[in-house]
Amino acid sequence: MGQVMKNSCWEDTAFWKNIEPDPQPMAARRVGGGHDGSSEFAGPVRREPLVLAVEDQIRFSPGVQTICEFLGIELEQVTSHRDLAPLLKAQRPMAVFCELDSPGQDGCHVMKIVAEHDRTLPVLVLTGDDPSLLGAAQAMEEILRLTGVVACRRLPAIGELVEFLFSAGRKGRCLSLMPG
């Protein structure tokens, strides 16, 4: 079972006491890479400090919500049956979280919709313990020429999740996440 650092602000959060952190560092989990970073948009896109969590069963959004609130980021949970394309266009999120193997709109479909919207949008894909799903995430990233996909077996440790969110905020020019 994962341990929370002593004297951290997460120490008393019951949710985190039941989360086992992924032992592989996030940097090593970066899927694919080496793409040219091209996007259908000219110049960097200004995004909102908003994360879309595509999930049908509330599995990872409660833990992410705690961190997002602490960082001043809005988290919106959307079901996998909702049309994601208009939502991406209207709300301009700084990142999308999804599960690769969900019952409705699986992670591969979410990645396809993200690629049609903005190939540079950071996507955190949870693959579970099935190694073939990691391979599927790598293949989809390569085929769709996505540049911001990070695949994890389960929700990353707190520090890595904060790092992912700050990186997404910088890329999306979310000024509320930038230091003073």
Segments from the language model and where they lie:
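His-Asp phosphorelay/catalytic-motif detector in bacterial-type signaling
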Residues: 92, 117-124, 147-148
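Acidic, metal-coordinating helix/loop segments flanking the phosphotransfer/catalytic sites
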Residues: 77-95
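Conserved phosphotransfer microenvironments
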Residues: 97-120, 127-136
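Alpha-helical interaction/dimerization surfaces of two-component signaling modules
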Residues: 66-70, 87, 140
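Non-catalytic signal-transmission and effector/linker regions of two-component phosphorelay proteins
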Residues: 1-61, 65-66, 156-180
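As written
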Residues: 107, 138-150
